[in-house]
């Protein structure tokens, strides 16, 4: 072991051989617990913020687990408001991409590229929906030849939308199609490297350098051709398709994703080619956000200004896909990051355009208004890795008549607002809250709402409504009522909602001693108003910035609040409360919730959500809340799916098969299933799925357990049942629940 202190400031720090650089004029405060590594090359998994102070971060060697404290890296223009990151302009055909231009919207065709007419028709439908750019898969020479005809036909029909070739394992195909398409997407994990076998390989320094020389030899001709023809390029890393070489040194990590892309970017820069963008995609929004932030932090260090293409890969379909995409893309847009976006849905590609546009509009508005809060010092947020700030869950107090320990859930809570009308039919209310009914009595289940808010309490003589609430309280469901209601129509054992004014004015002291408090606040209040939180006992905080607020950013106000709480060791759980206006579109609601609440939960900031919308279906709001928690890798209440959006490589009707599998397996919380049209990027694309259903050849399916294929060539008509059999084989199956009578 070694500890020590280096002089500060230290200029131009660079950790030897790790490819992790740090900018000039930064202070290296101290180095501790540095162990000698087996290799000359330091293995690095992730940069992590330290709790030691605002100017520190931890650099974690992958195998030894010893923190190296280094200066905290900048990853966005501002920590207290949305300011769009300045980038160079990259030309993709006739479309300019970068910070001086609108956030560009794009998608990808699903037709067989060799079907020229079908592909042309699909591109036109996409363009008519408003996309700026379209990507087409090009897997071989026949597809590359077809691309020339596709481009010609579109031009003849006055469709000049830029076309992007999606390339995997095919450098020669990339060279061919660069002569007609406007942009080439290369995957650093498989452009020059073989498909990952998930083997840990020990390289000497010379062996590693030879691998890099091989990449340069294979990649250079494409760079030179793109320069010659004025083509753009996307260096697009996928978390699931990192090479064995990268994973051996950096782990299956955001750090490895960044280094994989930088290897290719260094070659581009060496050849004086700069018309390229980066992407860091993953199916897990938490990993995706970390990777993009780390990428940008490294670009700041090097003085690079290349634009970003944002996307969550294999997001799925319907609300799930929109939610995952909003959590990942929306979070980064609030940080001012992102110049073009794609929402990857297992739906027709033109259906991706509307949610794409909604996300782009959110990001554009936030940056234009520079939504935020007054500057504040941020010391405690972990934005290069996930470390959840866990609020103290309620504990039972002496003399309490009911059990409050389950009014919040340790993995993330869902709160709902209910009306007096709903109390008129108690059994329907119990079902709406997803309780399990036994002889008409409610009991909490896996996906039951944890607590409810009533803005108006029933009259004291309304025995039906009050009995319904008592039964909910008796099974540890929290019932929250405003202070004024509880003082005039007291409900035994209710929790009481108070604001900061009611706290500072002492009105809450009119309540019986021991009453549980729920505090509602915005997060941008003067610190002297927040000071009262240090002197009270609250069961939870509801963080609520009005939806119509234009100048204050919900995300930045919450970050400021969490900073105050952490700095003062106030550990109340915080629930993100969003009250949507009447008439909001469902997709808009999902995307806002994913952006504004998900953007905090992926940083480990928050203990649950409460979504309100006066004219939206109650079940929809409840399901959306649970989907949000699951999308942020918090509380699992249903089967998790990793489902690719389909492309020209897909070997079956992905939408139809996906629906069939979901119908039969959606009741398996804690189980994750990958549904992949092909395995072009290798089994790593299935992320951390427990089981995989993958197109192996036309009409045939391969089944996976983890990243290992266990059954090959199953007829498609039998494959879904075979998947269920595999789940049963591994002890992960339960029969679907029987509906309550």
From Swiss-Prot:
Keywords: 4Fe-4S, Chloroplast, Iron, Iron-sulfur, Isoprene biosynthesis, Metal-binding, Oxidoreductase, Plastid, Transit peptide
Induction: Circadian-regulated with a peak in the late period of dark phase and early period of the light phase.
Gene3D superfamilies with a match to the protein in the record: Dihydropteroate synthase-like (3.20.20.20), Sulfite Reductase Hemoprotein, domain 1 (3.30.413.10)
The protein's enzyme class: oxidoreductase
Main location: plastid
Cellular component annotations (GO), alphabetically ordered: chloroplast; chloroplast envelope; chloroplast stroma; plastid
Tissue specificity as recorded in UniProt: Expressed in roots, shoots, leaves, flowers and siliques (at protein level).
Disruption phenotype: Albino phenotype and seedling lethal when homozygous. The phenotype is caused by an early arrest in chloroplast differentiation.
Cofactor note as given: Binds 1 [4Fe-4S] cluster per subunit.
Cofactor(s) in the UniProt record: [4Fe-4S] cluster
Pathway where this protein functions: Isoprenoid biosynthesis; isopentenyl diphosphate biosynthesis via DXP pathway; isopentenyl diphosphate from 1-deoxy-D-xylulose 5-phosphate: step 5/6
Enzyme Commission code: 1.17.7.1
Gene Ontology molecular function: 4 iron, 4 sulfur cluster binding; 4-hydroxy-3-methylbut-2-en-1-yl diphosphate synthase activity (ferredoxin); iron ion binding
One of the GO biological process terms: isopentenyl diphosphate biosynthetic process, methylerythritol 4-phosphate pathway
Similarity annotation: Belongs to the IspG family.
NCBIfam families, A to Z: ispG_gcpE
Job description of the protein: Enzyme of the plastid non-mevalonate pathway for isoprenoid biosynthesis that converts 2-C-methyl-D-erythritol 2,4-cyclodiphosphate (ME-2,4cPP) into 1-hydroxy-2-methyl-2-(E)-butenyl 4-diphosphate. Is essential for chloroplast development and required for the salicylic acid (SA)-mediated disease resistance to biotrophic pathogens.
Name of this protein: 4-hydroxy-3-methylbut-2-en-1-yl diphosphate synthase (ferredoxin), chloroplastic
């Amino acid at each position: 072991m070694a500890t020590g202190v280096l002089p500060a400031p230290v200029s131009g720090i660079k950790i030897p051989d790790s490819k992790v650089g740090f900018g000039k004029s930064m202070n290296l405060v101290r180095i501790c617990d540095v162990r000698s590594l087996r290799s000359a090359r330091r293995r690095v998994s992730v940069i992590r913020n330290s709790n030691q102070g605002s100017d520190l971060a931890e650099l974690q060697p992958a195998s030894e687990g010893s923190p190296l404290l280094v200066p905290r890296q900048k990853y966005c223009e501002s920590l207290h408001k949305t300011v769009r990151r300045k980038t160079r302009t990259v030309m993709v055909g006739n479309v300019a991409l970068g910070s001086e231009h609108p956030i560009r919207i794009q998608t990808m065709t699903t037709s067989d590229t060799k079907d020229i007419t079908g592909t042309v028709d699909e591109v036109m439908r996409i363009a008519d929906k408003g996309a700026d750019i379209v990507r087409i898969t090009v897997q071989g020479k026949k597809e590359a030849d077809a691309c020339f005809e596709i481009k010609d036909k579109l031009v003849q029909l006055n469709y000049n939308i830029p076309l992007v070739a999606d390339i995997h394992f095919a450098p020669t195909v990339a060279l061919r199609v660069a002569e007609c398409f406007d942009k080439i997407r290369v995957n650093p994990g498989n452009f020059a490297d073989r498909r990952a076998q998930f083997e840990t390989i020990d390289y000497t320094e010379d062996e590693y350098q030879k691998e890099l020389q091989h990449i340069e030899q294979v990649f250079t001709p494409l760079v030179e051709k793109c320069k010659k023809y004025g083509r753009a390029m996307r260096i697009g890393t996928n978390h699931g398709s990192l090479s064995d070489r990268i994973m051996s040194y950096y782990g299956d990590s955001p750090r490895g994703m960044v280094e994989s892309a930088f290897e290719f970017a260094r070659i581009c820069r060496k050849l004086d080619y700069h018309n390229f963008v980066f992407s860091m995609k993953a199916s897990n929004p938490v990993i995706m956000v970390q990777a993009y932030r780390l990428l940008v932090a490294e670009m700041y260090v090097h003085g690079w200004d290349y634009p970003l293409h944002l996307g969550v890969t294999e997001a799925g379909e319907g609300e799930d896909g929109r939610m995952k995409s909003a959590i990942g893309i929306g979070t980064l847009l609030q940080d001012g990051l992102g110049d073009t976006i794609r929402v990857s849905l297992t739906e027709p590609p033109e259906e991706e355009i509307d949610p794409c546009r909604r996300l782009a509009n959110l990001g554009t508005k936030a940056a234009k208004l520079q939504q935020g809060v007054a500057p504040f010092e941020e010391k405690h947020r972990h934005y290069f890795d996930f470390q959840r700030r866990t609020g103290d869950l309620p504990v039972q107090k002496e003399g309490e008549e009911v059990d409050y320990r389950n009014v919040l859930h340790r993995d993330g809570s869902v709160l709902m607002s209910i009306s007096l009308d709903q109390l008129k039919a108690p059994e329907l209310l119990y079902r709406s809250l997803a309780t399990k009914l036994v002889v008409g009595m409610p009991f909490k289940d896996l996906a039951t709402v944890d607590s409810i808010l009533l803005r108006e309490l029933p009259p004291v003589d309304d025995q039906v409504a009050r009995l319904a609430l008592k039964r909910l309280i008796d099974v540890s469901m929290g019932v929250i009522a405003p202070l004024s209601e509880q003082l005039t129509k007291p409900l035994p054992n209710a929790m009481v909602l108070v604001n900061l004014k009611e706290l500072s004015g002492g009105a809450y002291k009119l309540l019986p001693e021991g009453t549980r408090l729920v505090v509602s606040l915005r997060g941008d209040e003067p610190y002297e108003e927040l000071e009262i939180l240090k002197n009270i006992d609250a069961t939870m905080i509801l963080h609520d910035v009005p939806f119509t607020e234009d100048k204050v950013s919900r995300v930045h106000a919450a970050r400021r609040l969490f900073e105050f709480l952490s700095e003062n060791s106030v550990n109340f759980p915080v629930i993100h409360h969003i009250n949507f206006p009447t008439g909001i579109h469902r997709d808009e609601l999902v995307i806002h919730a994913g952006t504004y609440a998900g953007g905090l939960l992926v940083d480990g900031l928050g203990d649950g959500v409460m979504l309100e919308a006066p004219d939206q279906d109650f079940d929809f709001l409840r399901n959306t809340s649970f989907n949000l928690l699951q999308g942020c890798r918090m509380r699992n209440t249903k089967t998790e799916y990793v489902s690719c959006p389909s492309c020209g490589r897909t070997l079956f009707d992905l939408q139809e098969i996906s629906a069939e599998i979901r119908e039969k397996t959606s009741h398996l919380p804690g189980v994750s299933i990958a549904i992949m049209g092909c395995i072009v990027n290798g089994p790593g694309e299935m992320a951390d799925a427990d089981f995989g259903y993958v197109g192996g050849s036309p009409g045939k399916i391969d089944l996976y357990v983890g990243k290992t294929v266990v059954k090959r060539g199953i007829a498609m008509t039998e494959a879904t049942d075979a998947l269920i059999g595999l789940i049963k084989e591994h002890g992960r199956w339960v029969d679907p629940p029987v509906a309550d009578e």
